[in-house]
């Protein structure tokens, strides 16, 4: 490996770490804002939306975005998003038996300030994103419907309303949007005949009266990838991987596909205490490396009692408030934002600012798989001694993350406080 390739990989790892930090910090902030509701969002999608803003930002606004995303420059950010889109977010279709992944970023501005040609070209070439001019000032509802129609087209009608009514107005200057859909089958599907209904204890947890009755749980007698830590356990459920993707260079096509295949997994972080979710997520947010450092080892272990609830979550709305709490403020300020590399100057003297970042995610987990539009003390045993069975019973609130393991990209994240609620 030459020095240039080593430097590129170092930059890629740094931004990947920034994505993980964004994932756990957003999970913390969004969860705190809605403690009694299930949560689903795509950190990678939000990361890509902010990258689109960075492509048109300058000065302190650009510096602030880069700092939140863990990138040293716009070029590094564009390279990371492009490479991730080609690998982690590549649709491995039914033909390859891999996950179905649909990802569509887009950016819209008001007609009074059209995009600069250089920005339009950059987001198309580097992010494969649509850059569109609409009339927010005079035809706001028409603009909203146009953006939602884009989302329907981009996701094959899987996501239909990225922008709900009244989410944009005549004062809106720019909207950044992302639509993402994921459908993957478990590497080892659960047997539907083993599914049984049992109580699930909500976040207030203490008594049987607080339990949600008759929640369907998936169960299995197979070995599972489970790690036991101080105060919590982690389960990793892998999705079926696609057939190996041969390096293009071996076919004479040139280029680098960034590894031979993608490998997705869902990690469930289950606190020991029924009311321990909030504290666990705060621990994760305090140190970005926490998530990947606590993932289970590659080899499965025997399990005793094992239950994971089926669930479906649909979440949508603005993520601006949470991002402001993470220190990203200048892009959303009408007085201070510097997006001068994005749109033409209309002579008004008012700087362009990001009016909103709307985001929607849909996740469903069942027996077949998933549909989705800190110091550690580990007890080691000699290899000749079989480990004792581990119980993993997710009968109270837990956090989950869908990760593409080859790139470490956190594609989806959230928490479940009540599997009976969508």
Swiss-Prot record:
Any Pfam family matching the protein: Serpin
Record site: Reactive bond: 383-384
Keywords: Protease inhibitor, Serine protease inhibitor
UniProt superkingdom: Eukaryota
One GO MF term: serine-type endopeptidase inhibitor activity
GO CC terms in record: extracellular space
Region (RCL): 369-393
Domain notes from UniProt: The reactive center loop (RCL) extends out from the body of the protein and directs binding to the target protease. The protease cleaves the serpin at the reactive site within the RCL, establishing a covalent linkage between the carboxyl group of the serpin reactive site and the serine hydroxyl of the protease. The resulting inactive serpin-protease complex is highly stable.
PANTHER family: SERINE PROTEASE INHIBITOR, SERPIN, SERPIN-Z8-RELATED
Function: Probable serine protease inhibitor.
Entry similarity comment: Belongs to the serpin family.
Name of the protein: Putative serpin-Z8
Lineage, opening ranks: Eukaryota, Viridiplantae, Streptophyta, Embryophyta, Tracheophyta
């Amino acid at each position: 490996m030459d020095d240039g390739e080593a430097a590129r990989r170092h930059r890629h790892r740094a931004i990947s770490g920034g994505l993980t930090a964004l994932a756990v910090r957003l999970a913390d902030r969004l969860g705190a804002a809605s403690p009694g509701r299930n949560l689903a969002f795509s950190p990678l999608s939000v990361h890509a939306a902010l990258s689109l803003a960075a492509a048109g930002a300058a000065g302190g606004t650009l510096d602030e975005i880069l700092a939140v995303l863990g990138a040293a420059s716009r070029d590094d950010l564009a390279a990371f998003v492009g490479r991730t889109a080609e690998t982690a977010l590549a649709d491995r279709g039914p033909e390859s038996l891999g996950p179905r992944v649909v990802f569509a970023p887009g950016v819209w501005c008001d007609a009074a300030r059209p995009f600069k040609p250089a920005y339009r070209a950059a987001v198309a070439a580097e992010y494969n994103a649509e850059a569109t001019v609409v009339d927010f000032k005079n035809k706001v509802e028409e603009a909203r419907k146009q953006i939602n129609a884009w989302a329907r087209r981009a996701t094959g009608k899987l996501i239909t309303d990225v922008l709900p009514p009244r989410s944009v107005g005549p004062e809106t200057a720019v909207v950044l949007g992302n639509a993402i859909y994921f459908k993957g089958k478990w590497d080892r599907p659960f047997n539907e005949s083993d599914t049984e209904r049992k109580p699930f204890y909500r976040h207030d947890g203490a008594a049987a009266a607080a339990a949600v009755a008759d929640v369907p749980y998936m169960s299995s007698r197979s070995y599972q990838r489970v790690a036991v830590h101080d105060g919590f356990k982690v389960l990793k459920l892998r999705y079926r991987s696609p057939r190996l993707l041969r390096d293009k260079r071996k076919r004479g096509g040139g280029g680098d596909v960034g590894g031979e295949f993608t490998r997705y997994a869902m990690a469930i972080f289950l606190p020991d205490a029924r009311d321990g979710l909030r504290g666990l997520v705060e621990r994760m947010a305090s140190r970005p490396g926490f998530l990947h450092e606590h993932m289970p080892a590659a080899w499965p272990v025997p399990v005793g009692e094992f239950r994971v609830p089926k669930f479906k979550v649909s979440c949508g709305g603005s993520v601006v408030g949470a991002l402001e709490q993470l220190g990203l403020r200048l892009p959303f300020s009408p007085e201070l934002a510097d997006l001068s590399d994005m749109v033409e100057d209309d002579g008004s003297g008012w700087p362009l600012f990001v009016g909103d970042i709307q985001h929607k995610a849909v996740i469903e987990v069942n027996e077949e798989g998933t549909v989705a539009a800190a110091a550690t003390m580990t007890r080691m045993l000699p290899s000749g001694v079989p480990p004792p069975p581990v119980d993993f019973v997710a009968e109270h609130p837990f956090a989950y993350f869908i990760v593409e393991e080859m790139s470490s990209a956190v594609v989806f994240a959230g928490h479940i406080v009540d599997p009976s609620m969508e």
